[in-house]
Amino acid sequence: MKALFFTRMFTLMVSCLMYLSIVKEDNWFGYVFIAAGAAMYAANHVLLTKETNAIWFCLIDIAIGFSFGFIFPGTGLFIIMLCPVAVAFFLRGFPKRTAWSVLCLSSILFLTVLIRTYAMFGNEFVIDHLTSMTFVVFCGVVGKLIRKLLDAQDTAKQQFQELTESHLALSAAHQELHLYAKQVEELTAIYERNRMAREIHDTVGHKMTALLVQLQLLREWQKRDSQKADETVGVCETLAREALDDVRLSVRTLQTENDPSLIESLKQLTEDFCKNAGVTTEFAVSGDPAIIPLSLHPTLIRTVQEALTNAKRHGGAAACSIQLACTTDSISLVIKDDGKGNPEAALGFGLLNMKKRAAEHGGMIRFESERDQGFTVNAEFSLANKKWSFGPVQQKESLS
């Protein structure tokens, strides 16, 4: 751009100097006009670099050029002046409407110069002027192409800057995602450790505590009553066996939790329970289980495990049924056994733990028990809205 700047100024000043060679010595008006034109060209050349009022400075340059052609009709030097003016005009990138208006005005001025030239010299210089004007057109095309090239460079720079900013933002997002994934992994590991610790504490830990109490009681009964001691030994064996069963069932449940298919996990769990406990178990599913969130799978599996264990251990059930219903709004899980039932029973560790797991997911569990009519676990999980509810075991004991 600097080269074009100085070349334009050099061309205009040289053209003005060449006009001095054709002016007669007694034509003082010609000298004054050339000096004024050169001064205005120089001033406009500096002012044209500003963004404001650029169109007016271009119009002044065009008017000065055609004025030289009108004042000195016997030479085509004014066309040389118009060449850098045309380049500068199209280089500014004016709107199409403005450009066409200026072209129409320039055509009128050029036609005026041609008429004056024809009136004074005939066809001698008119044809030369028309031929030379093609160079002005060529310079205008060159200026337009340079403007497009500069616009393309500006667009490329802007796109490169945007691409660089996007790359930096993407790198930062990738780093944040990596840190987030690491945090999720750590939190998942902590959650699993806490969950396993809670399972051990609430199941095996409870049994081992009861076993320790019975062993301490056994020591006292050995000194006082051998029959009571034998009964206590039987209780200790039962507690130890139940604790071992809890450990085995917990291990199998943890293995099934890693299975991506919830239905297959529940089927395997009920099948193992049927084989080990000798309880007839029925498992039914309605709706599409694919809508169940993965985060809810362990809770459903643990709920079924705890309900089946209680059915055999506390209810002495011979048959159990599991019904899983899936809708777009909620998940319903009902486990019912045909055990002896106990409507007056308080919530033990297993049932309380079951309610805690459901509450973590905004679910609700109700326990229904009727004497000699078994025990029912009703679990509801809303997929649209979370709901927290608290209440005791519902009693349905008949007065017979």
UniProtKB/Swiss-Prot annotation:
Location, primary (coarse class): membrane
Keyword terms: ATP-binding, Cell membrane, Kinase, Membrane, Nucleotide-binding, Phosphoprotein, Transferase, Transmembrane, Transmembrane helix, Two-component regulatory system
Record has Chloroplast as a keyword: no
Segments passing through the bilayer: 3-23, 28-48, 62-82, 102-122, 126-146
Modified residues (Phosphohistidine): 201
Domain Histidine kinase: 190-385
PTM comment, free text: Autophosphorylated.
GO cellular component: plasma membrane
Keyword Magnesium found: no
Compartments, as annotated in UniProt: Cell membrane
InterPro entries from the UniProt entry: HATPase_C_sf, Sensor_HK_TwoCompSys, Sig_transdc_His_kin_sub3_dim/P
Single annotated GO MF: phosphorelay sensor kinase activity
Extracellular domain ranges by topology: 1-2, 49-61, 123-125
Catalytic activity: ATP + protein L-histidine = ADP + protein N-phospho-L-histidine
Outcome of gene disruption: Deletion mutant does not show any observable phenotype.
EC number of this enzyme: 2.7.13.3
Membrane topology classification: Multi-pass membrane protein
Record's signal peptide: none
Residue intervals on the Cytoplasmic side: 24-27, 83-101, 147-400
Function: Required for resistance to linearmycins, a family of antibiotic-specialized metabolites produced by some streptomycetes. Member of the two-component regulatory system LnrJ/LnrK, which induces expression of the LnrLMN ABC transporter in response to linearmycins and other polyenes. Acts as a specific sensor for linearmycin, either directly through binding or indirectly through membrane perturbation. Probably activates LnrK by phosphorylation. May also promote biofilm formation.
Name of protein: Sensor histidine kinase LnrJ
Gene of this entry: lnrJ
